[in-house]
Amino acid sequence: MALIATSMYALDRSIRLSRLIYYLPLNTATLTPLRASNATRVTLSRSMAYAAPGSHAFLYIPSIRACQTHPFTMVSRDPVEFVISARNGFTKDLFKAACERPGRKVRTGIEGAYGCVPKTLGYDRVVLFAGGSGVTFTFALAVDWAKKQDAESKQSLDFIWSVRTAGESKTFITNDNDSSNQAS
């Protein structure tokens, strides 16, 4: 039994590693500090057109942490974009690197996309709630929902986002046109 479990684990790690190696040489990310919200915008040079809005993927940025991957929710998929709150460890180091050289380009591996997105088109009213950096998921859903509406649509969308400071909301408001053009 232990041999089967070990084999499955080794296979999983091998597949993930091969995906990272495949995407790493051809992919760069631009790091942009979002000082008002203490976050980093990470924009990849390659798209993931097959990813659903609100999906998550594992990022590998060897110049920040050589042997670690971390899961983050995509804000958009063409190009792939993440907004990552600076907390501790990797995210703090990522924010520091972005602040030291805004617009810095780094080699980046990406593995994913993962996640199941709820279907919202069959309802008269859609209400999306988010708190803090959890907005990356609901923002991507809202932009995708808006793009799928036609002129005669009777559906409505309520978007509720709780933030600690007004600065946090500027992360998306000031970049709304860019993100909404790229989110679907």
Regions found by a protein language model. Give the residues of each.
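Intrinsic disorder
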Residues: 5, 48, 129-132, 153
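Short helix-terminating capping/connector loops at secondary-structure junctions
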Residues: 103, 150-156
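FAD-binding FR-type
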Residues: 39-128, 143-147
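C-terminal, well-structured subdomains that either form a transmembrane helix-short loop-helix hairpin
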Residues: 115-146, 156-164, 168-171
